[in-house]
From Swiss-Prot:
HAMAP family: PanC. CDD domains: PanC. (R)-pantoate binds at residues 61, 155. This is Pantothenate synthetase.
Length: 301
């Protein structure tokens, strides 16, 4: 495994593989790698000869300075994990390398519509930061394939639209969320939880499954469902952030034509902001069927 911090160095190294006709798969990360990230790496290996991973905590996508400062940075441990996975190339730039003139003078990439609804409405500029860094990394790495976790459902939709709109010749692969044994979606931010908070955190996934069961059982009073779900989170000591029930294809409000919904959830617990999502087929099930499916794993980093 070779590690590069400079753009010219990693670009030059990867051009050698391109000239040899070897296929490149790319996994962009912000480090503090866990099994979810490693699942992306393994999926990338299925699609390509060369696997490239980037580790970069992108300041442009953070809307709170404390969140950026608290984000775990574990580079040495990350490199050890990537070595064990047989990754070929790791790109570890600094903010000064990626944004040499600072964020204020950086050209940005903005995806209209999808970037300003749902999470984008409450975190202005977040998705612009995501698409700008992903676009820049794509230009540096020039991958044939890129793998992203489905846990960040809206982010994946935004990236797919950017790739389509800009006619990028890159195949985007969505990889299902990896979960802990108790259902909690794996996340770099889980490391911020205290022992007590970690024990309460799975309530987010359980509440999400309850919402899914309610929808499959035929309920369409979405505002009431969300209110009840928020009460469940508060009762467990979580602070609800956002819950949306939307059309999984468009991320717009559900209509009679919607065939699949998506539940998008976030909540604060201690220093961590937890997120999760699950898709739900809009076919009304019997009460027994809905209850039997209530424990199924959710779709979603």
């Amino acid at each position: 495994m070779q590690t590069f911090a400079e753009i010219s160095a990693v670009r030059g190294h990867l051009k050698t593989f391109k000239r040899e006709g070897r296929k490149i798969a790319f996994v962009p990360t912000m480090g503090n790698l866990h099994e979810g990230h490693l699942t992306l790496v393994r999926k990338a290996r299925e699609y390509a000869d060369i696997v490239v991973v980037s580790i970069f905590v992108n300041p442009m996508q953070f809307d709170r300075a404390d969140d950026l400062n608290n984000y775990p940075r574990t580079l040495e441990e990350d490199l050890s994990k990537l070595t064990a996975e047989g990754v070929d190339v790791v790109f570890t730039p600094t903010p000064e390398i990626i944004y040499p003139e600072g964020l204020d003078k950086q050209t940005f990439v903005d995806v209209p519509g999808l970037s300003t609804i749902l999470e984008g409405a409450s975190r202005p500029g977040h998705f612009r930061g995501v698409t700008t860094i992903v676009n820049k990394l794509f230009n540096i790495v020039q991958p044939d394939v890129a793998c992203f976790g489905e846990k960040d459902f809206q982010q994946l939709a935004v990236i797919r639209k950017m790739v389509d709109d800009l006619a990028m010749d890159i195949e985007i692969i969505g990889v299902p969320t990896v979960r802990e044994m108790d259902g909690l979606a794996m996340s770099s931010r889980n490391g911020l939880l205290t022992l007590d908070e970690r024990q309460r955190a799975p309530v987010l996934a359980r509440t999400m499954r309850w919402i899914s069961s309610a929808i499959r059982g035929g309920r369409d009073d979405y505002a009431s469902i969300i209110e009840d779900a928020n009460d469940q989170l508060r009762a467990a000591g979580l602070h609800p952030d956002e819950i949306f029930i939307r059309d999984a294809r468009t991320l717009q409000v559900i209509t009679p034509e919607t065939t699949q919904a998506v539940i998008l959830m976030s909540a604060f617990l201690g220093q961590a902001r937890l997120i999760d999502n699950q898709t739900v087929d809009m076919v009304v099930e019997s009460k027994d069927e809905a209850e039997s499916n209530d424990g199924t794993a959710a779709n979603a980093e």
